[in-house]
Amino acid sequence: MGRKEEEDCSSWKKQTTNIRKTFIFMEVLGSGAFSEVFLVKQRVTGKLFALKCIKKSPAFRDSSLENEIAVLKRIKHENIVTLEDIYESTTHYYLVMQLVSGGELFDRILERGVYTEKDASLVIQQVLSAVKYLHENGIVHRDLKPENLLYLTPEENSKIMITDFGLSKMEQNGVMSTACGTPGYVAPEVLAQKPYSKAVDCWSIGVITYILLCGYPPFYEETESKLFEKIKEGYYEFESPFWDDISESAKDFICHLLEKDPNERYTCEKALRHPWIDGNTALHRDIYPSVSLQIQKNFAKSKWRQAFNAAAVVHHMRKLHMNLHSPSVRQEVENRPPVSPAPEVSRPDSHDSSITEAPILDPSTPLPALTRLPCSHSSRPSAPSGGRSLNCLVNGSLRISSSLVPMQQGPLATGPCGCCSSCLNIGNKGKSSYCSEPTLFRKANKKQNFKSEVMVPVKAGGSTHCRGGQTGVCLVM
């Protein structure tokens, strides 16, 4: 079970005047506005860790860090990144994290070449096991999403690790009320600003499972406000042809997790007993071609959203694992300062931004129709009304936005504006186009041709054009 240390994180901090006396700084793994993450080697033991160096600043909320520490120091599970130690100096906090070098979930799927339902089932089984452990210890993650699922090592049989506990919460009487998370993965009760429980994590696992089997999210709309309305309605589809080769057992599993009523939604314990997880109903048919294409299209890499969270210390994948003991990696970086504060990124809105490349289809070839196959557990809602959404800025203040548009989902093609497939209207019998929520896709894989910004279609003056957009939202009650 979890560690039994005192709740006051100050009792856990070790004071230091020079962190380099304890660790050898080897190379940078990543950086954010207030922190940098280094590959370090402990001088006494020779062990390798990821060291997150957080610069003390009036703009950085100590309460957020202490919440993260309070959660991380309580837990110890084979599928959860471990907080090993904490140091503090007059200028920095230092979080010593377990080194995770296997890369992100999506990256590994793209590298496989062959991918089946059974592969997805094994991933979700590990996630359910870890989240079940969190829930048993009174902890709700609240921000489960694919980019928070990393592989421990580059080996093919590596374990999945859950990271990023910045939004985690220790339950008080089993109920919480602060609305937070990532659009597209947030449960309906959170968006409805109702009190919620650990069931929100199970909803997120349902969304992740859906994505792993088709490459795009279950909820996508033209605007954030419409996206939120669709999530609150709890309505989604298993569209053809993307779901034609997926088993009914997998769809049933998803339906039980994407249950609108949190009281009827599967718990982690129930989900672990489902035949798709615990039985032999997950198919071994290769779904790589379709899923990989949709993942590359809908989850483009976005450098301006690459802010490191407490446990997300991976950027060196296979290169790091293969060279850990080579002379070039053992070379110290003694002259590098612990932190070089990066300027806060702003929302890109240049019309000249680069876009995700897409092949041009033969205009004489008709586009495949997307047949609507409603989930048997859902009823079709009326068209969602428009609305405004609250976008949380870096300093915590709120602004109103109604123009942000997620990426569009559908077969790759060139849009009517000539820029990208995101502008393409794909549907059947006048139905609106299908959109997906663009998500951070960190990857050092040179094989993939991802651009630095997520491109979204924006209607202006009767025409559609592309520009960069941000969808990360935290709703604060």
Swiss-Prot record:
Region annotation (Calmodulin-binding) ranges: 297-318
Record's bilayer topology term: Peripheral membrane protein
Regulation: Activated by Ca(2+)/calmodulin. Binding of calmodulin is thought to result in a conformational change and leads to activation through phosphorylation by CAMKK1.
Tissues of expression: Highly expressed in brain, in neuronal cell bodies of the central nucleus of amygdala and ventromedial hypothalamic nucleus. Also detected in heart, testis, and kidney.
PROSITE patterns membership: PROTEIN_KINASE_ATP (PS00107), PROTEIN_KINASE_DOM (PS50011), PROTEIN_KINASE_ST (PS00108)
Keywords: Allosteric enzyme, ATP-binding, Calmodulin-binding, Cell membrane, Cytoplasm, Golgi apparatus, Kinase, Lipoprotein, Membrane, Nucleotide-binding, Prenylation, Serine/threonine-protein kinase, Transferase
Low complexity: bias regions: 376-388
UniProt-reported outcome of changing residue 474 to S: Loss of association to membranes
Places the protein is found: Cytoplasm; Golgi apparatus membrane; Cell membrane
Gene Ontology terms: cellular component: calcium- and calmodulin-dependent protein kinase complex; endomembrane system; Golgi membrane; plasma membrane
Entry EC no(s): 2.7.11.17
Chain segments carrying region Autoinhibitory domain: 277-317
GO molecular function: ATP binding; calcium/calmodulin-dependent protein kinase activity; calmodulin binding; protein serine kinase activity
Record PTM: May be prenylated on Cys-474.
Family: Belongs to the protein kinase superfamily. CAMK Ser/Thr protein kinase family. CaMK subfamily.
Domain comment quoted from the record: The autoinhibitory domain overlaps with the calmodulin binding region and interacts in the inactive folded state with the catalytic domain as a pseudosubstrate.
Full protein name: Calcium/calmodulin-dependent protein kinase type 1G
Naturally occurring in which organism (per UniProt): Mus musculus
UniProt lineage: Eukaryota, Metazoa, Chordata, Craniata, Vertebrata
Gene name per UniProt: Camk1g
